[in-house]
Amino acid sequence: MSHIRSRFSKPADELVVRYTTSLPFDWRLYQEDIKCSTAHARMLGKQSIISAGDSQSIINGLSDILTEIETGSFVFKPEMEDIHMAIEGRLFELIGEAAGRLHTARSRNDQVATDVHLFVKNTCTSTINKIRTLQGALLKQAEAHQQTALPGYTHLQVAQPVLLSHHLLAYFEMLERDCGRFTDAKKRSDVMPLGSGALAGVPYPLDRKMVAEELGFTAISQNSLDAVSERDFVLEYLSDAAICQMHLSRLSEEMVIWSSAEYAFVELDDAYTTGSSIMPQKKNPDVAELCRGKTGRVYGSLNTMLTVMKGLPLSYNRDLQEDKEPLFECADTLGDSLEVFAGMIKTATFKPERMLRALEKGYVLATDIADYLVGKGESFRSSHGIVARLVSYAISQNKTFGELSLEEYRQFSNLFGNDIYAVDIKSALNARNLTGGTAPKQIAQAIARAKKILAEAGVKN
């Protein structure tokens, strides 16, 4: 019987053991747990809370356990309810009774909280790195397509001409905000709960700062009740992940649409597409579709954790065991999505000629023609109505703006002159020459800014 059940007269029911164990999933915290235990043991020895000999024996034993786990020789025993007890149990086997001194001045409550803080902190770092890689892929494509124009859309209807670079850099900006959010989340996870005990602190002269420094934390928790029971930092990571995955889902939707035969704006590389079991001609954008579908998993992780936390009184409750599966699944899903998307964007082939064809038949210059009339002295509202009627006429005649005669233009306003034919895609793009606009000069500046952002982040592009 586990020493934790020494107060009870009989062992836990077998079903209860299976129901309450977390080892099948929290084994992933073994690195964080061993790192925390090593720092704790070292501090206990330094503070003479345990002997220097026991401290060193514990540290050596933990090092051996880490090697066993990473080489696959460690035996995960099902009777051990979590990774923390599995490691401690093996430590007893390796060094004997000295292992019992490791848990001095520590509870699993602050132990687990510290492990999860470390995991989230490290995951924020890896997530940011993966976002940077995807940003680099988007930037490369944007650089290559500074002269490629396509329709910009509202309501998925052709609206105004934009440069493909401008479109791709929109996602760069979304991802840049994601990096900022994960950087903030990392700050909130960079707080060490260890030393809080079960809930009220511990009656030992701990050197919490020493442990924090060894573990790489820049701050220690200030309230033991809060420290063992808060999971705000997990919620913040999950919330940030949901927003980031949503951005990927939006890009997924566009890759699905743009790669269809009706659009054919992009061809996805064979390595990132699949075929059909019955239709030989198919080249399906499954990676983009799955990324879009997996967004629900990430949202689900956030909703799960919010629900876990919503009714918990201070301080620790076993409900908090339910923080790990949604956290792990979310981290895996987002991490994989970012990695696969970086490869898919890097290898995608965009089709400028198809985009140009779409521009030619969408009346994308309607706003520019209205602006032309404004330049001639007409109010914009009046110009809007004139051009709306002009568009209806052009559609009825099955003509583009460029195919209308000057006489036809002048049926709608005498302000139209021969210079109306100077209003074209190039002039429309050049006219948006202000910060944030799609003009080529602005795109060049935006690309330079994006390069600077990545360079300052240490990303080679």
From Swiss-Prot:
GO terms for cellular component: cytosol. It comes from Dehalococcoides mccartyi (strain ATCC BAA-2266 / KCTC 15142 / 195) (Dehalococcoides ethenogenes (strain 195)). GO terms for biological process: arginine biosynthetic process via ornithine; L-arginine biosynthetic process. It catalyses: 2-(N(omega)-L-arginino)succinate = fumarate + L-arginine. It comes from the Bacteria. Keywords: Amino-acid biosynthesis, Arginine biosynthesis, Cytoplasm, Lyase. The keyword Lyase applies. SUPFAM superfamilies: L-aspartase-like (SSF48557). The gene is argH. NCBIfam families: argH. Belongs to the lyase 1 family. Argininosuccinate lyase subfamily. Its EC number is 4.3.2.1. It is found in: Cytoplasm. It is an enzyme of class 4 (lyase). This is Argininosuccinate lyase. Pathway: Amino-acid biosynthesis; L-arginine biosynthesis; L-arginine from L-ornithine and carbamoyl phosphate: step 3/3. One of its GO terms (molecular function) is argininosuccinate lyase activity. HAMAP family: Arg_succ_lyase. Pfam families: ASL_C2, Lyase_1.
